[in-house]
Amino acid sequence: MNYQIVNIAECSNYQLEAANILTEAFNDLGNNSWPDMTSATKEVKECIESPNLCFGLLINNSLVGWIGLRPMYKETWELHPLVVRPDYQNKGIGKILLKELENRAREQGIIGIALGTDDEYYRTSLSLITITEDNIFDSIKNIKNINKHPYEFYQKNGYYIVGIIPNANGKNKPDIWMWKSLIKE
C-alpha cells in the first residue's frame, strides 16, 4: 500500500478532511461526540495545538485516517484520537498510524502512552454487569469482546488494560483505560 504521512496542522484541507472523518466514523457507531462539522472542527483544532502530536495518512492524496497524542503526565501522554475513515477500516491503517505515533513519541522522550476507549454501546462484557469493588478486577481480567470493541486492536499492538471507570458514560457504560510502555529493554 502506498501512503504518505502528513502533518494535519500544516494544511487547512487536511483539517477539514480530519473533521469529516471524525464525524463520519463516530456517527457510524451511533456516537454523538462530534455530531456535526462545527464540533469536529473544534476537536481537530485542539488536537493540532502545540505541543500535541497530530498527523494523518494519505492514500491517493486523500486523508483516510489520523491520530493524535497530547500531554497527560510529563513522560506519559494520552492517545486521542485514533480515527480511520469507515471504508478504510480493518485494512491496517490504524496500525500504521499507531506505530508511527509510537516512534515519534519515543523520539520526544515519551516513555508511555495511555488511552481511554469507551464502551458506550454495550460492546464488551464490562457493560453487561454492575461493576463493584468486589468484582472490578476479575471483570477486567475476564473481559470479553461482544461486538467489535477496539480494546482488542490495542491489545494486539501491545497495550493492556490498566483500569476502568465503571459508569463514565452512564450506567454500565465504562471507559476502559489502557497503557503501553515505549521503553525498549
UniProtKB/Swiss-Prot annotation:
Q: What does this protein do?
A: Catalyzes the transfer of an acetyl group from acetyl-CoA to the 6'-amino group of aminoglycoside molecules conferring resistance to antibiotics containing the purpurosamine ring including amikacin, kanamycin and tobramycin.
Record-annotated N-acetyltransferase domain positions? 14-183
**InterPro entries xref list:** Acyl_CoA_acyltransferase, GNAT_dom, MshD_Acetyltransferase
Q: Annotated Gene Ontology MF terms?
A: aminoglycoside 6'-N-acetyltransferase activity
- Protein origin, superkingdom: Bacteria
Residues where substrate binds: 34, 73
Sorted keywords for this record are:
Acyltransferase, Antibiotic resistance, Plasmid, Transferase, Transposable element
Subunit architecture: Homodimer.
Stated EC number for the protein is 2.3.1.82
Protein name as catalogued:
Aminoglycoside N(6')-acetyltransferase type 1
Q: Which Gene3D superfamilies match?
A: 3.40.630.30
Biological process according to GO: response to antibiotic
- Substrates-to-products reaction catalysed: kanamycin B + acetyl-CoA = N(6')-acetylkanamycin B + CoA + H(+)
Q: Which residues bind acetyl-CoA?
A: 147
